[in-house]
C-alpha cells in the first residue's frame, strides 16, 4: 500500500489571486504526419464537469461523450495548431509552443493565468505556469487534453479516407510498424513531416 502512495501525484495547488484560469495541452508531437494540435480551456467553476481525466487514459467513447459537455459548459475554449510545414521550419518543440500561443490567443475570454501541461511555457502576455503531469492534476488541462485529442483523432480519420493505404485511423500517424511499412510501400504524402527521421529516410534525405 505504501508503495502505491509514493506513486500518487501530489494534488495541484492553484496559485492565489487569479480569477480566470486557462488550461492548455497538446496532442501530436510524436506522429510523423499532420498538425500538432493544442487546446486552451477556461472552465466555469459554477458548472463543474464530472469525469475529466487525461485524454490518453479515457476511452474514445468517453472522450467523445465529454467533448460536447466541455464545449457547452466552458466559459471559453479554442484550438491552436501548427502545420507539418511549420513543424519542419521551426522544429516540433517550437511549433508546439506556437500552437499553444494560438490556442490562448483564440480564447474569447482572456485568462489572467495559463496553466500549461509539461515543463515549459510558451511566451504569453499573461502569467503562466508549467505543470508536470498537469493533464492528471488540473481540470482545465484535462479538458484541453480531451478537446485536442478528439480534434486530432478526427483529422486523422479524415486523412485515412483520403489515403486508406496508410491506416491513419488506426495508428493516428504515430511511428508504428504498420505506418513504417506503409511509407516503405507507398512513399510519403504532403502531410508527412519531412524533418522527422523516418520520413527523411524514406525521401532519401541525408542527415
UniProtKB/Swiss-Prot annotation:
Its main location: cytoplasm. Gene3D superfamilies: Ribonuclease H-like superfamily/Ribonuclease H. It is found in: Cytoplasm. Keywords: Cytoplasm, Endonuclease, Hydrolase, Manganese, Metal-binding, Nuclease. GO terms for biological process: DNA replication, removal of RNA primer; mismatch repair. A divalent metal cation binds at residues 25-26, 117. PROSITE patterns: RNASE_H_2 (PS51975). Its cofactor is Mn(2+); Mg(2+). Its EC number is 3.1.26.4. InterPro entries: RNase_HII, RNase_HII/HIII, RNase_HII/HIII_dom, RNaseH-like_sf, RNaseH_sf. It comes from the Bacteria. It catalyses: Endonucleolytic cleavage to 5'-phosphomonoester. GO terms for cellular component: cytoplasm; ribonuclease H2 complex. One of its GO terms (molecular function) is manganese ion binding. SUPFAM superfamilies: Ribonuclease H-like (SSF53098). Manganese or magnesium. Binds 1 divalent metal ion per monomer in the absence of substrate. May bind a second metal ion after substrate binding. The keyword Hydrolase applies. Residues 19-207 form the RNase H type-2 domain. It holds the Pfam family RNase_HII. Endonuclease that specifically degrades the RNA of RNA-DNA hybrids. Belongs to the RNase HII family. This is Ribonuclease HII. It comes from Vibrio vulnificus (strain YJ016). The gene is rnhB.
